[in-house]
Amino acid sequence: MNLINTIKDCIVERLHVLNAKKLIILDDVILSKLVVDYPNNHDYGDLYTNAALILSKYVKKDPLDVAEILLRELSNIKEISNISVVKPGFINFNLSLYVWYEVISSINMLKEDFANVNIGNGRKVNIEFVSANPTGPMHIGHARGAIFGDVLANLLTKVGYQVVREYYINDAGTQIDVLVESVYLRYKEAAGQDIVIGSGLYPGLYLKEIGQLLYEKYGTDLLEMNSAQKMKIIRDISLKHLLDLIKQDLVLLGIKHDVFTSEAELLRNNVVEKCVKLLEDKKLIYYGVLDQPKGTENNNWQPRKQMLFKSTDFGDDVDRALQKVDGSWTYFASDIAYHFDKISRGFQHMILELGSDHIGYVKRLKAAVKALSDNTATIDIKLHNIVNFLNNGVQVKMSKRSGEFLTIKDVIEEVGIDVVRFIMLTRKSDAVLDFDFVKVVEQSKNNPIFYVQYAHARVCSLMRNAPNILKIEDTDFSVLSSKEEILLIKLLAKWSNVIELSAKTAEPHRITFYLIEVAETFHMLWGYGNKDVNRRFIIDDDINLTSARIYLARAVAYVISSGLKIFSIVPLEEMK
């Protein structure tokens, strides 16, 4: 049940009546611009519409005059109790109380299905997230993007999409060569040789385990093998071992990908060449000289002809190089090929989660997808910013290359998986997030996950102690008349809209914000009962009022439970 859509349908029906009377002009283009939404300020009413503003441009009248025409017709909508016009032409209206009371009934009858909306209609969507380089275990810094991608996948599944979770294994390129060389040193160390870890290599102690595994399996044989043979063995074993570690960390976070795609395998299968051939056939490849990149020292750059992709034809800032000086493919060429592979697998809609340091990839990848699909496929690139990990306000540092970093296992053992999954979504993904190990386990209103869970647990406690109540169809909800009760009901009515908007924008943090607001509003209402016995949820001598308030509380629990399950968090029935 989406109240906005319901009221919007009523308004559209009335606009068609006015159109039939030749009082306005109406067509699909105009209707596509129609907005019905909640105002930012409650003083403006329950909902507003821009109908008069958009229609005024077509009927060539002042928006306020158009609003007066609409006012007379919209006043006939039975769900609307009060309607007004404000400059420059917005129409604000309040809904009849019975509409809000029906929300309580709907939530209690539909339970966690109350906010089910089908905007995906079974369409396939590919969400690629994490894709950490397999050069070491994941550290807790990777958790933000991982949780974002997984919760987004849950959300899109809920609204009717067929979701595939994908991990791109960057198992080709320079960083893998560095990994192999680093592991070989650890193997030599396991074989009893003295080693010196040079600059630029991975010094992490986690590589000692791989070196020991190689020594236990091959003894000193690798020392005698030719370089190509031993490096292949080291590469294969190292990548498998490290990818297994990454998968174990993902399991700790409650995440399981459906597909793992190897960059090296794409290269072996000549997918880059096939992709370049396709772009050549589209006349989107040429040889040219790029301008010197900004910030590049003169002695480090020389102009030269390169194979270039006409990405500026599709909104990019500059055309992009596809080949290096030595003839090997650039990273971007591999990225294009990977997305060509996704499109070839039938994905017309893709979502890619990247760290904010990859912001320069946004335009070029969007351009590539447009070019490869003839503008039929789309890619939505969501950037996540860094997480500042704090211990009572003091920053905790981590670095893969230094060999010392905070592991996902460390954090989950300390605060729990539910805390990690919720806190990682308490800010918009592209904003910096502070994660304080002390504050996230506090049992106070300053800890959002505690406050939300506490609201759910309070309702469960209320239900355990509640007397027998009236059937919902026999309950008169008009007794819920206080300002705070109506405010909570109106907030619960927004749940469907929050789900739909979060899915359409690929912004699951909106759900976090909403659940926190629901919890705060419920706790505030509960607090009034501590000061005034007549404001409590259970009134011994009034079975109808008790029933109405319990159904309201139960609606809160259903909404919170539904939201937490999108995060794969178990709603608590009692706090420990």
UniProtKB/Swiss-Prot annotation:
It comes from the Bacteria. GO terms for molecular function: arginine-tRNA ligase activity; ATP binding. InterPro entries: aa-tRNA-synth_I_CS, Arg-tRNA-ligase, Arg-tRNA-synth_N, Arg-tRNA-synth_N_sf, ArgRS_core, DALR_anticod-bd, Rossmann-like_a/b/a_fold, tRNAsynth_Ia_anticodon-bd. It holds the Pfam family tRNA-synt_1d. Its main location: cytoplasm. One of its GO terms (biological process) is arginyl-tRNA aminoacylation. Keywords: Aminoacyl-tRNA synthetase, ATP-binding, Cytoplasm, Ligase, Nucleotide-binding, Protein biosynthesis. It is found in: Cytoplasm. CDD domains: ArgRS_core. A motif ('HIGH' region) lies at residues 132-142. The keyword Cytoplasm applies. It catalyses: tRNA(Arg) + L-arginine + ATP = L-arginyl-tRNA(Arg) + AMP + diphosphate. GO terms for cellular component: cytoplasm. Its EC number is 6.1.1.19. Monomer. PANTHER family: ARGININE--TRNA LIGASE, CYTOPLASMIC, ARGINYL-TRNA SYNTHETASE. Belongs to the class-I aminoacyl-tRNA synthetase family. This is Arginine--tRNA ligase.
